[in-house]
Amino acid sequence: DLLGSPSGARKQTLMLPIIYYAKKDIVDPNILISFPTNENIELHHIFPRAWFKDNENSNTFPNWYADKDLLRERRDCLVNLTPLAAQSNNTWKAKSPSTMLSNFTNKAQLPGKDIWTNRFIANNCHTALLNDQPESFMNFRAIEVAQWILDQTNI
């Protein structure tokens, strides 16, 4: 369901860690986005919708390209979303992850830092972002989120 389109209570449950575990904005790590905040927080498509459309080819999507419905579902799936401050969402807009990440200069934006790990973006996910590999990124991130959810249920 993390790579699909769940609805209702299932969607809300799966979104909880994605929305509430992140503490700082990616684009500007000085902006706190955790509750309570005065910032206007928006959900951002990590691989933006416009980017998906502009890069719809078999090189970018070797396993998904043949199925347009699957591509659309993956574009809007939960693991392609992350909370950002509204101003950061506007800065990122339709840019590829690699374009955005190449502009980061703050040490807090380095791989393995809280702004990534609190979003379930481990080093393998970060590498996929740097290489604009949405399939790898989403598969890796889905595993990270699912594992965290399972870990929370262990007694």
At which residue positions do the language-model features occur?
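Short beta-strand-alpha-helix junction that forms the catalytic/metal-binding core
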Residues: 41, 53-89
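Context-gated lysine
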Residues: 11, 23-24, 53, 68, ...
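Generic structural "secondary-structure junction" signal
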Residues: 48-49, 80, 94
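Homeobox/homeodomain signature
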Residues: 4, 31-37, 68-71, 110, ...
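Intrinsically disordered, low-complexity N-proximal targeting/linker segments that flank membranes
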Residues: 1-51, 55-56
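Long, cytosolic, alpha-helical-rich C-terminal regions that act as interaction/scaffolding modules
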Residues: 73-76, 86-155
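A generic structural signal for ordered alpha-helices
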Residues: 24-25, 63, 123
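Non-catalytic, well-ordered alpha-helical scaffold segments
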Residues: 12-16, 41, 79-82, 98, ...
